[in-house]
Amino acid sequence: MRPVHRGPAPAGGFANYRDAATPLMTALGDYCSYCERQIPTHMAVEHIQPKSSVPALLTSWTNFLLACGNCNSCKGHVPIALADYLWPDTDNTIRAFEYKLGGLIEPAPGIGPLVLLKAQATMRLLGLDKYPGNPDPARRPTDADLRWQHRRQLWDFAEKAKARLLANDSIQLREQIIDSAVLRGSFGIWFTVLGFDADMRQRLINGFCGTSTTCFNAAATPIPRPGGVI
């Protein structure tokens, strides 16, 4: 899950929270802040604290992220305790989750018991642990939830790009791969598959607008986020 920085609130604020959609997409790109899919239309302005339970934050810039319909629906409107979860705008979430062959997501190894609980809770909250064949029937996706399929397809696509890079490395090819990644989304998958190459890691960080640069060191390696739990 890509760590993001939305930047300062636009001058004048918002009379209607839906008006924040365009500024958010300008700041963060047209990607779901949770599953990372590129969503060209109908992106929801996501309230981190549900608007029904914390109406005071209805139009608060710092309470906004972007969400696809699947992540938004899974998260719902139930009151939550922010400290029980990990958030891409306050934590270095790229360190908390591991993307694996086939596009599966799991808590990253070695993150410690406290962060592990938060990572597991975050996956359950957003339904990121849902995939066909899950031993728990409640954690299998509906027919309308194709996030797992998108991750699998992007993993395969990224692996092909990696193979081309290893076979015929060039600046032009590196730029083309980043262009493809930015157009398709799923930062975490690209960062995992191309993570062996520091230059490509840095190009991904630079290419995906709104990526929090404080979450990476000079070698483009993920580091603890200042003020975050990871």
Model-identified regions with their sequence ranges:
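Alpha-helix initiation and capping sites
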Residues: L58-L65, D91, P113, P141, ...
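Short, charged surface segments at domain edges that flank catalytic/cofactor-binding sites
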Residues: M1-Y31, V54-T62, A158-E159, A163, ...
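C-terminal, charged low-complexity interaction regions
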Residues: M123-I230
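A generic structural signal for short, solvent-exposed coil/turn residues
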Residues: L24, R37-P40, D89-D91, F97, ...
